[in-house]
């Protein structure tokens, strides 16, 4: 079985997806709560800071995946946000050229953590044992993160990788929620492409069975929570910045983006009665985790919100590791 190293591994979404397509591995995670969940789930785990490790510590790994925390690079076009982005893009270019990067920049969690996957990739290349496949994904600040992945792509192509970047919609990969994720897939031994959606995109007001007949319907909340009966979810976020105008979706639609605030979502019955809020297991189902996944530790809602949806992870890892002939076909 192919072996992977998973950086910023969280509770295990990337691992479960990777294992589904034949890639086993070990994850590095610093958060004690996420580590508790991983251990309970039987996932191979190193509890530590990815900055203290490197490829030499995991010599069997030929695949690298990562979902580095990407701090807010821009808030309302702030000068500080633009400067942070400029610093990161400059550092990516410098690292590719093997020139020194300001240690203060690398030590700043706002900028340094998003550079860690590149440090690992380049170190593996320079050691003569390069990763044959790379998968990077992130949900926060999608447009800004995509700039970083595009800068990574320029460096990796110079090193001989085939690279594809883009923004994917989770409901098109069998996840019962609408969410966009900025992704990068790369491989060293052949061409690569982003995974093709298997399901239709969600459009408000368009029936689940309508649209491109070549694709399967998106999944609704009711599809994975059939025991719940009829309900409407009321978002904890206001539409257009108006806290009084909270979005609503019925069980016949996908969930809103699952975030660390999912425990605040209200569920109401058709007659207006308040229903019990989502359990951790139910919230995990909306991210593609098994119903009995052993969520552990504290701040479980945040763990769930931070996780990579399992089905999307499987599609990404398969795209990066499938035989080259499949891509060419």
Residue ranges and their predicted role:
Residues 64, 184, 305:
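Short, conserved catalytic/metal-binding motifs centered on acidic residues
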Residues 19, 35-39, 53-61, 73-257, 321:
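Class I S-adenosyl-L-methionine
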Residues 12, 33, 69-71, 140-141, ...:
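Short, solvent-exposed loop/turn segments at secondary-structure junctions
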């Amino acid at each position: 079985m192919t072996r992977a190293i998973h950086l910023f591994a969280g509770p295990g979404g990337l691992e479960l997806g990777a294992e589904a397509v034949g890639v086993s591995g070990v994850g590095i995670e610093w958060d004690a709560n996420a580590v508790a969940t991983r251990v309970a789930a039987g996932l191979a785990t190193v509890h530590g800071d990815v900055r203290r490790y490197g490829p030499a510590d995991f010599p069997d790994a030929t695949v690298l995946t990562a979902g580095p925390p990407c701090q807010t690079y821009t808030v309302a076009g702030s000068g500080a946000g633009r400067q942070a982005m400029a610093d990161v893009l400059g550092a990516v270019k410098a690292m590719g050229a093997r020139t020194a990067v300001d240690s203060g920049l690398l030590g700043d969690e706002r900028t340094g953590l998003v550079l860690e996957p590149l440090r690992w990739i380049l170190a593996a290349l320079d050691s003569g044992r390069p990763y044959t496949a790379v998968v990077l994904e992130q949900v926060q600040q999608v447009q800004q993160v995509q700039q970083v992945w595009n800068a990574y792509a320029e460096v990796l192509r110079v090193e001989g990788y085939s690279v594809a970047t883009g923004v994917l919609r989770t409901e098109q990969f069998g996840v019962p929620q609408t969410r966009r994720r900025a992704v990068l897939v790369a491989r060293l031994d052949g061409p690569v492409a982003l995974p093709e959606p298997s399901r239709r995109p969600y459009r408000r007001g368009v029936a689940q069975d309508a649209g491109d007949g070549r694709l399967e319907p998106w999944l609704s909340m009711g599809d994975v929570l059939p025991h719940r009966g009829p309900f409407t979810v009321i978002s904890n976020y206001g539409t257009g910045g108006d806290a009084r105008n909270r979005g609503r979706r019925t069980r016949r639609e996908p969930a809103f983006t699952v975030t660390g605030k999912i425990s605040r979502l209200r569920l109401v019955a058709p007659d207006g009665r308040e229903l019990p809020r989502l359990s951790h297991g139910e919230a995990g189902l909306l991210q593609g985790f098994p119903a009995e996944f052993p969520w552990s530790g504290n701040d479980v809602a945040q763990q769930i919100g931070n996780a990579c949806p399992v089905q999307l992870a499987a599609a990404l890892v398969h795209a990066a590791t499938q035989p080259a002939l499949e891509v060419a076909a």
